[in-house]
Amino acid sequence: MSLMSETMQSQPEQLRGMLADTTGVDAAAERLRGRSLFLVGTGTSWHAANIGAWFLRAAGVEAWPVQAMDAVLYGPRPAGGEGLILLSHKGTKTYTTQLLERARAEGVPTAVISGQGAPGAEIETSVVERSAAYTASHTGAMLRLAQLATALGADLGPLNGVPDAVAEVVEGPAVGVVPPRRAMEFVGAGPNQWTAAEGALKVRETAYVASAGMGVEQFLHGPSVAVGTDDTLICLDGGGPGGERLAQVARSAGSAGVPVRMIAGDAPNELLSVFPLTAAVQRIALETAETLGTNPDSFGRDVPARASALDGIAL
């Protein structure tokens, strides 16, 4: 069994632990209350930052997701009257580290959401992962963001149902998406456009399959033209107002011979649907890697020349 598979199976229990132990959440909420907030991350943490912005806007917070590199090199970045929520699996990435140092030096209040024992963590998520394909730390970061938004006044629904919703997916039958001959496309509406982006990232880094993930309207206006019978379109339905548009796009693609899978998130509302749908795209990535015989844990370092190429870049 891969490390990714083991970690995915551990998610429900780790999420229950986070619901039981909210250390740091209330204190962070008080530091950030009444401020415009920047949510910053890289890779999977960038997807969490965008979903977190949806949660925080439900609390009436002005929330701005920004890529870590962009914040450091270009801006915008938080100033004195604003706050920073920084997301990092291990607290070691180049630009998130630089941004955190700068923010603290300038007196910007922060909430650092990271793995257990990670440098600078103010709100801890999961046990630090051994697989390069981050899963539990992502669902954990989303739960911490939901808790933070709730502490700031958001009514997101019953967070105590999140672990069981994730368990139903990771412990259930295979999702069963057959690897396409060419590309795997993920689309979603509302917050689940970022679940779609996470699905594409996971499929690429675990199974080495060409993939893209985006909002359903963005997909329709251009990218959909390139999708054909050698591809697979995966539609992530969170049950919100964009669901009808998602169904229209799915029907249109299917009528052109594109293999289409519609996956619904079993949750009380669209915002909480990101949890079971994230678990679903994790399973799709893992199942694709297992079918194709790739190593989902290695970040491609077992591919000839890839390890030495990556060693020349500071992540």
Predicted ranges, named:
Residues R251-L315:
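Phosphate-moiety recognition in structured ligand-binding domains
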Residues T206:
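Active-site diphosphate/adenylate-binding microenvironment
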Residues M1-M4, H47-I51, E198, T278-R283:
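Conserved phosphate/anionic-ligand binding catalytic regions in large, soluble enzymes, centered on
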Residues P173-E198:
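Internal active-site segments that recognize and position negatively charged phosphoryl groups
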Residues A212-E217:
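A structural supersecondary motif
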Residues G24, L32-G172, A189, S224-A267, ...:
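Glycine-rich phosphate-binding loops that contact phosphosugars or nucleotide phosphates
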Residues M1-R35, E168:
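An N-terminal, well-structured beta->alpha segment
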